[in-house]
């Protein structure tokens, strides 16, 4: 009895995780009930005979969870059955011309050659990804048609009935899959990618609190709960196979919603690959946080501000990308956070060069530099992800994000200036939208700017000595000298720190 209760609980859990699974089960039952009428209804049975069972078999093996998977399998099975049936009839005809003695030998040779070649072709990566099931059905159908034709006089009628029932079963699956609560693989892939961005952004935004705040004895349970929430990123580490399968299924699907035919699904895989690289760094970062060797808090505090900003701004950038993907809009807001994370990286570089950690023990230095190196990697990957997402948005024709019309400019975001920079790196503050209906010549202290568009973005660039205003048409374009973050600063400091200690 306890076993039954456990099965019921498991069924409820699976159904609650994704209610579409329950609907899919009913859809399969409906398809099987429909094609079973070929066998139960006497006029249909008189026409197809026992071959009606091929329709039932087709539903069982073709009906998949998503529309793309069902379409892919259905088309593979139909085309493979048609081609294999034609070749089987041709092989039977050629073999019959050689006489009853040689006929079985030729049929065996034909079956051997085609089965061997087809099986070898299944190892091709492209065939394995999209046509493996079709090649398998081709081998099965050719063997059945050619071999059974040796004992069957009406070989053409046999092939016709099998092909007809297979097509009927496949069409039933496709129609029910598309028109009864459809599940689109393309939509699932799109949602999965947006969810992965959101998951990683959660870790990066919470990293500062986890790394720099000391754990009080009374807060151990709360800290453990927070750590479990942070480890949600692990689902991204193993998402490659799922993403590739969904992208493969999505290629079979017709246009639906905002996903047109020949949607750039390959670009989704490129973005997902970069995201997994970030997840691997985050996994290493999390392991370093939870390692037995912990760095004293007073040492961490020396570089707390830039590290917090690097992780927080990278997390905010990924959060903005997640929102942009969910809404399928083109937004440049996450570029601002990328610039801010690069600015924080430059601040960290300046601090490290100043020798602020010269008194740190070598072993502590190694642990600290591991964290720094991983965060620098994540910042650089965030910039690559931003560029890849822009390519995806352009290829997929995402909508332009609507900008609120304002008569007066107002500050909507600011990147903190860094006074410690050796170079004149610009830090950007976006002031807002400026509406101009006519051509206006604006004279600034550093030159003249001609404004000839209805919508502009005012960008204020803070330098150490002066302030410049800049207007640009259309989307926000941030022009600034991005910092190139690499491992040289961390490795150089580690070498010098070890030598000094």
Swiss-Prot record:
Induction per the UniProt record: Up-regulated by aluminum.
Pfam families for this protein: ALMT
Biological-process GO terms, alphabetical: malate transport; monoatomic ion transmembrane transport
Keywords annotated in UniProt: Ion channel, Ion transport, Membrane, Transmembrane, Transmembrane helix, Transport
Record family assignment: Belongs to the aromatic acid exporter (TC 2.A.85) family.
PANTHER family tied to this protein: ALUMINUM-ACTIVATED MALATE TRANSPORTER 10
Subcellular location: Membrane
Main localization of the protein described in the UniProt heading: membrane
Function description: Malate transporter.
Ranges annotated as spanning the membrane: 22-42, 52-72, 78-98, 101-121, 130-150, 166-186
Keyword Cytoplasm set for record: no
A single GO cellular-component term on record: membrane
Annotated membrane topology: Multi-pass membrane protein
Name listed for the protein in its UniProt record: Aluminum-activated malate transporter 2
Renumbered residue ranges of the record's region Disordered: 398-425
Domain of life: Eukaryota
Signal peptide: none
């Amino acid at each position: 009895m306890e076993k039954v209760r456990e099965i019921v609980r498991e069924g409820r859990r699976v159904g609650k995780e994704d209610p579409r699974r329950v609907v899919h089960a009913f859809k399969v039952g409906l398809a099987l009930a429909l094609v079973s009428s070929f066998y139960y209804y006497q006029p249909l049975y008189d026409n197809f005979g026992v071959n009606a069972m091929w329709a039932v078999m087709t539903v069982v093996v073709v009906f998949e969870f998503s529309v793309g998977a069902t379409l892919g399998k259905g088309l593979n099975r139909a085309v493979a059955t048609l081609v294999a049936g034609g070749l089987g009839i041709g092989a039977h005809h050629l073999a019959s011309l050689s006489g009853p003695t040689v006929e079985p030998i030729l049929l065996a040779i034909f079956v051997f050659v085609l089965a061997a070649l087809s099986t070898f072709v299944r190892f091709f990566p492209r065939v394995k990804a999209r046509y493996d099931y079709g090649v398998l059905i081709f081998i099965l159908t050719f063997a059945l048609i050619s071999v059974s034709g040796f004992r069957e006089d009406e070989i053409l009628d046999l092939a016709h009935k099998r092909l007809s029932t297979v097509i009927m079963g496949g069409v039933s699956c496709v129609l029910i899959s598309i028109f009864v609560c459809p599940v689109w693989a393309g939509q699932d892939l799109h949602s999965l990618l947006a969810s992965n961005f959101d998951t990683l952004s959660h870790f990066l935004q919470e990293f500062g609190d986890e790394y720099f705040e000391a754990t009080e004895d009374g807060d151990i349970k709360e800290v453990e709960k927070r750590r479990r929430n942070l480890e949600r990123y692990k689902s991204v580490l193993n998402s490659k196979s799922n993403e590739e399968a969904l992208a493969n299924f999505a290629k079979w699907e017709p246009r639906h919603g905002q996903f047109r035919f020949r949607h750039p699904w390959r670009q989704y895989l490129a973005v997902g690959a970069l995201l997994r690289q970030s997840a691997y760094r985050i996994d290493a970062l999390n392991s370093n946080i939870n390692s037995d060797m912990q760095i004293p808090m007073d040492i961490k505090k020396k570089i707390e501000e830039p590290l917090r900003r690097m992780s927080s701004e990278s997390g905010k950038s990924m959060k903005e990308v997640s929102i942009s993907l969910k809404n399928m809009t083109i937004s440049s807001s996450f570029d601002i956070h990328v610039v801010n994370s690069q600015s924080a990286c430059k601040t960290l570089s300046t601090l490290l060069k100043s020798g602020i950690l010269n008194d740190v023990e070598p072993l502590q230095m190694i642990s600290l530099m591991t964290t720094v190196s991983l965060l620098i990697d994540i910042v650089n990957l965030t910039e690559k992800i931003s560029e890849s997402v822009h390519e995806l948005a352009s290829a997929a024709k995402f909508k332009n994000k609507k900008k609120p019309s304002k008569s007066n400019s107002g500050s909507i975001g600011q990147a903190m200036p860094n006074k410690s920079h050796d170079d004149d790196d610009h830090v950007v503050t976006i002031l807002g939208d400026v509406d101009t209906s006519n051509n206006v010549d604006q004279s600034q202290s550093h030159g003249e700017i001609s404004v000839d568009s209805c919508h502009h973005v005012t960008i204020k660039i803070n330098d150490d000595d002066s302030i410049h205003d800049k207007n640009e048409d259309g989307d926000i374009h941030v022009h600034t000298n991005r910092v190139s973050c690499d491992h040289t600063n961390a490795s150089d400091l580690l070498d010098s720190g070890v030598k000094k200690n």
